[in-house]
Swiss-Prot record:
It comes from Rattus norvegicus. Interacts with U2AF1L4. Component of RCOR-GFI-KDM1A-HDAC complexes. Interacts directly with RCOR1, KDM1A and HDAC2. Also interacts with HDAC1. regions. Interacts (via the zinc-finger domain) with ARIH2; the interaction prevents GFI1 ubiquitination and proteasomal degradation. Interacts with PIAS3; the interaction relieves the inhibitory effect of PIAS3 on STAT3-mediated transcriptional activity. Forms a complex with EHMT2 and HDAC1 to promote 'Lys-9' dimethylation of H3 (H3K9Me2) and repress expression of target genes. Interacts directly with EHMT2. It is found in: Nucleus. Residues 1-20 are annotated as: SNAG domain. A zinc finger (C2H2-type) spans 256-279, 285-307, 313-335, 341-363, 369-391, 397-420. This is Zinc finger protein Gfi-1. GO terms for biological process: cell fate commitment; cell fate specification; cellular response to lipopolysaccharide; DNA damage response; inner ear auditory receptor cell differentiation; inner ear morphogenesis; mechanosensory behavior; negative regulation of cell fate specification. Residues 141-258 are annotated as: Required for interaction with RELA.
Amino acid sequence: MPRSFLVKSKKAHSYHQPRSPGPDYSLRLETVPVPGRADGGAVSAGESKMEPRERLSPESQLTEAPDRASASPNSCEGSVCDPSSEFEDYWRPPSPSVSPASEKSLCRSLDEAQPYTLPFKPYAWSGLAGSDLRHLVQSYRQCSALERSAGLSLFCERGAESGRPAARYGSEQAAGGAGAGQPGSCGAASGATSAGGLGLYGDFAPAAAGLFERPSTAAGRLYQDRGHELHADKSVGVKVESELLCTRLLLGGGSYKCIKCSKVFSTPHGLEVHVRRSHSGTRPFACEMCGKTFGHAVSLEQHKAVHSQERSFDCKICGKSFKRSSTLSTHLLIHSDTRPYPCQYCGKRFHQKSDMKKHTFIHTGEKPHKCQVCGKAFSQSSNLITHSRKHTGFKPFGCDLCGKGFQRKVDLRRHRETQHGLK
């Protein structure tokens, strides 16, 4: 094997040796022919005064390229190689054959130079009329609005197909005339909402009204109230008719109105309890002591305190004691002589609203409470309860001195006064 292959070359490569532009470097640049020129000559004297860094800068390349292309007879207009087309002769970094010193000098010139912009052609907006520009802006805004409401529209469309609440509410709203939307259309997307955010719930109000409507066959309907199952049955004489049970949901203000007596409630539960207690005749909670019935379990618990002997509520004016706080509050109206409830027929005033309603039955002759045994009717429920004790023989009031029982409390008081001399 020759020794020339074993000995490393002592001659350094040309690209490892630093090159400094000598006095003849600019002369060689002047004599370099430019391929884009028509005469194929060298660089002119005016261009020779420009430094090499400036001739290689991006600004010089971007500005001089169209000039040289326009002066060239060999230029191919309309083709890809056309310098005046979109594919202009942009500046590119030097090749790796340049020395490291020249690369450093070029990079320094690029860092010092200002950032350049690509020569994009400006869009001719002046070619469009004012109406065309407005049409473009409006179409863009409509597309943005459709993108924002895409999820809501998708929910409404799926609700119309699968029977979701949105489609069901929309169809009932369209059928009831509350809104102009079709079944499955979303009222929130159309922006038809009332002040205060009530429109969002007002759209669904007709559907909620069906919760309180009872058909004529509501005799076997099962009611739920605080864990108690209330079964309405015609066999026990419960009055359940649609004209008494039908209620209406008002759209304004979120109030619930009974169409039988026009009483307004703030919650649907309050309206349901009112209909069951006042109009349906369903009073399933009965007292074991006196047989009095109540429409609510809480009312029965409060009533049981009447049969006990404990009187924990005392009047500070006269010293009279009561078993219930509500009875004491009613008693205090006697001392203040406050009678806020007048009769609409004779003008007589009462302390309690219930006393005023009982009094009005005298003028109207109405007797809504009827005995199930003999058919006798009474204007007050208390009179019906006292009358029913004649059929059952129940005597809840007993004398503590002789043990004699009575059906009415007034009879016990009279017995104590006449027989025992007590007041």
